[in-house]
Amino acid sequence: MRIEMDTSEIIKKQISENAVVLYMKGSPEAPMCGFSAAAVQILEACGAEDVATVNVLADEEIRQGIKDFSQWPTIPQLYVHGEFVGGADIMREMYQSGELQKLFGKS
């Protein structure tokens, strides 16, 4: 008998096992929306390393579950050290102010 983890448990596990997690549409190599592409570019510009990505288009339960988990309605979503940072617009603002680089120890 296989025990299924519920979606929120899967998300908690992904966030706890990776220092940086980006929930996005598509992959870093082939983003499927402009906001996800922008998020990847911002992380690259910050010098973020070992970024785990989750393609929400591959799993409907994760796509809806991450929105419920964060209480944030849009994708992409960035988590750093277990904390929800925000989406592409917030990432851009934080990058421009230098705050995002500090999260990665790159300031």
Functional labels for PLM-detected ranges:
Residues 1-4:
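Short, Lys/Arg-enriched N-terminal segments with co-localized hydrophobic residues
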Residues 68-74:
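Thiol/disulfide oxidoreductase modules built on the thioredoxin-like
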Residues 80-107:
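Non-catalytic, surface beta->alpha helical segment in thiol-disulfide oxidoreductase systems
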